[in-house]
Every structure is written in structure tokens, then in C-alpha cells.
Amino acid sequence: MEIDILHFEKKYPNFILAGIDEAGRGPLAGPVVAAAVIVDQNNIIAGIKDSKKLSKKKRELLYEQITANYIWATGIISHTEIDKINILEATKKACILAAENLSTKPEIVLVDGNMQFSDKRFISIINGDNLSLSIAAASIIAKVTRDRLMLELSNEFPQYLWHKNSGYGTKEHAQAIKEYGLSPYHRLSFTKALYK
């Protein structure tokens, strides 16, 4: 059975609806980034799906199309804030910030995952990046935005290979931490126990 990726958008036809997804919950370094997208249902961009199912080249192409045609915004929470409030709270904060940063205020906000929000406009959808075009578009914006941020940080700290691993705990990244120690961008709450 084919999944209708516009199912949730069709469910709320008379509301301004935004989709939100995040990138960067699991890495050892860098921020968590959430993106919010309001899709124009009269202008559906072909090929939008969960960013994890797309090649880097395709993600970049879709990023350009989404940002040119849809209302979108990001919310970025730093590694230091993640260490202060924990990754779950930081992710929620990034999602709320992304919604607040939209130039048009959404009446319904679909969020990928199972996080609980006090704001009743926020509806969490498990596997949402496969079930909602708005969330899938947001997953692309979040992923590309975060990858670009990590590329910038990699220019400053090339030894950690963030341009390749985006801050995730790959074997090479772990080896670099052992060899060079932690950078100012590492999440201490993620790395302290591993790399004293």
C-alpha cells in the first residue's frame, strides 16, 4: 500500500500547517537544528521525502527548491545549551524556536517523533518524515543546514573530520578525540564519560 505523504496536510485543509523535523540529536559535537516548513499545496515539489533516504546531492537540490518556494525557518540550539538542559529539552526548544521564527504563524504544527509539547498546536507524529510532506521538507532543511554548519566548524577543527561525519561518533572521530582531546564544540554531556 502506497503512503500518501500529503495525508496530514489533507487532514487539516483549512489551517495554516507547518511541519517540523530536527537534525543532530545524536552527534558528539555541534548544535541541534530544527526546521519548520509551510508547504504550498498548490506547488508540490517532486522528490521530497525523509532526508535520510536522499543522496547529499539530491538533498542540496531540494533544499534550494524548498527554500525558494515555501515558507521556512530554523531553530538552532548550541552544544553548550544542550549540555545545560539535555538533548531532549534542547530539541524541543529548537522545534519551538523554528515555529516561532516562521514569517507566517502556523495554526497546526506537525512534529516528527514522539515529543510532548504544552502548546496544543504541536502534534507529534511517529515516522512523520515519511507520513507528512511538510515534515519531510523540514527534515531536508534541518539536515542541510546542520551539515553546512558542521562544514564551517570543520574548517576550524579539521582533525575531527566533521565535514564527513557531521559530529557523529564515528571511529575516526573517536580516534581524533583520543589524539587531540575535545574541541570547544564538543558536547561534554555526550563525551565526558567516553573521553576523560
Curated annotation (Swiss-Prot):
Keyword Metal-binding among record annotations: yes
A GO molecular function held by the record: RNA binding
Keywords: Cytoplasm, Endonuclease, Hydrolase, Manganese, Metal-binding, Nuclease
Cofactor binding note from Swiss-Prot or TrEMBL: Manganese or magnesium. Binds 1 divalent metal ion per monomer in the absence of substrate. May bind a second metal ion after substrate binding.
RNase H type-2 domain segment(s): 15-196
GO CC, any one term: ribonuclease H2 complex
Keyword flag Repeat: no
Subcellular location: Cytoplasm
Superkingdom classification of source: Bacteria
CC cofactor: Mn(2+); Mg(2+)
Gene3D superfamilies for the chain: Ribonuclease H-like superfamily/Ribonuclease H
Example of a GO biological process term: mismatch repair
EC number: 3.1.26.4
Residues that, per the record, bind a divalent metal cation: D21, E22, D112
Catalysed reactions listed for this entry: Endonucleolytic cleavage to 5'-phosphomonoester
InterPro entries assigned to the protein according to its UniProt record, in alphabetical order: RNase_HII, RNase_HII/HIII, RNase_HII/HIII_dom, RNaseH-like_sf, RNaseH_sf
Record-linked Pfam families: RNase_HII
Family as reported in the entry's similarity comment: Belongs to the RNase HII family.
Function, as annotated: Endonuclease that specifically degrades the RNA of RNA-DNA hybrids.
Listed name of the protein: Ribonuclease HII
Organism: Rickettsia bellii (strain OSU 85-389)
